[in-house]
């Protein structure tokens, strides 16, 4: 299994995701893929046995925020591996961008109309996704992954405590700068649950350490828009910004590119996700750090929880996926840990 995980991740980093073959028609979306393969006798991990396989070829739909990013590619890979291990069909799809809320709602409704056996959603906007999922409550397992939503009767949430994880980065920067330091935050979608939780964790830990947060702006979760946002911040606060705390690694990369284009190399930039692209920049001295989630495990565990629920097993209402701060001190060890999966 470890070798397979490594190969899957390497493929994600090398090429953009392509739709996999399916034993049934794929959902009507250009950003959809499905996996349906025989159950594997190999355990999901060394510490956790594979749950009992489904008695038939169940179909689990996973609607992510998008498939057009490195991070969500890792989540999809985890879902695909779970499909292999449990011998089920898993449809993975998502809108063209995380800002496409109405497109995601339509995808959720489409999957429910196909009479799937369970559905897992990473909501672009929590209330919109919850509204689309409400008719499924009590009929099939309904789970959230990465980003939670308020929905009475939902089965479970699988993901990182975003506020607590972001606080790791905020405290690190506060300790580095010392009291009186100045920072800015580049958040994701304004008002979106994950973005607000991470922003809260950043700001509270920075302010507790005596750091002034000069401003917070949205980078829309992408490198190019975050680059433009950082350009604006640099123009408004010349020679003041000492650190930037970002919603995700794409945001951090955009901020770093803006700094580089302006000949600035002394601003500490923190990302969030633990993507290899960001860790490589940490080792190159261009990023200060990233808060590593475990997106592959997150996708795997979400499908695993859905299978358990279909099988009638009791699952926890919250299934946590731990995060850790990656800096230059442990970046190589983090990459070595990934590489060791192939052994």
Language model features with spans:
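Sec-dependent N-terminal signal peptides of Gram-positive bacterial secreted proteins and lipoproteins
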Residues: 2-23
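A residue-level marker of the well-folded mature domains of exported/periplasmic proteins
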Residues: 13, 22-343
């Amino acid at each position: 299994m470890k070798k397979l995980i490594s190969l899957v991740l390497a493929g994600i980093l090398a090429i953009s995701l392509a739709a996999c073959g399916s034993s049934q028609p794929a959902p009507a979306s250009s950003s959809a893929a499905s996996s349906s393969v025989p159950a594997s006798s190999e355990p999901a991990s060394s510490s956790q046995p594979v749950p009992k396989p489904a008695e038939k070829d169940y179909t689990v739909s996973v609607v992510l925020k998008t498939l057009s990013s490195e991070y969500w590619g890792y989540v999809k890979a985890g879902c695909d591996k779970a499909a292999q291990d449990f011998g089920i069909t898993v449809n993975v799809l998502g809108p063209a961008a995380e800002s496409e809320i109405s497109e995601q709602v339509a995808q959720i409704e489409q999957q429910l109309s196909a009479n799937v056996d369970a559905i897992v959603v990473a909501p672009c906007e929590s209330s919109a996704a919850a509204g689309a999922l409400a008719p499924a409550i009590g009929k099939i397992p309904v789970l959230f992954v990465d980003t939670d939503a308020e929905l009475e009767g939902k089965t479970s949430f699988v993901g990182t405590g975003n506020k607590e994880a972001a606080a790791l980065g905020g405290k690190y920067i506060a300790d580095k700068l010392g009291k009186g330091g100045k920072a800015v935050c580049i958040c994701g979608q304004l008002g979106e649950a994950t973005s607000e939780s991470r922003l809260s964790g950043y700001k509270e830990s920075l302010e507790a350490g005596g750091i002034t947060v000069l401003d917070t702006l949205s980078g829309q979760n992408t490198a190019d828009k975050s680059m433009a946002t950082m350009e604006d911040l640099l123009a408004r606060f010349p020679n003041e910004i000492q650190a930037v705390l970002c919603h995700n690694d794409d945001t951090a990369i955009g901020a770093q590119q803006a700094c580089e284009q302006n000949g600035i190399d002394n601003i500490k930039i923190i990302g969030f996700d633990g993507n290899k692209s960001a860790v490589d920049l940490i080792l190159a001295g261009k990023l200060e750090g990233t808060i590593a989630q475990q997106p592959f495990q997150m996708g795997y565990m979400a499908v695993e929880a859905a299978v358990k629920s279909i099988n009638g097993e009791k699952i926890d209402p919250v299934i946590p996926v731990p995060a850790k701060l990656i800096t230059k001190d442990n970046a190589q060890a983090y990459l070595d840990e990934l590489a060791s999966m192939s052994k």
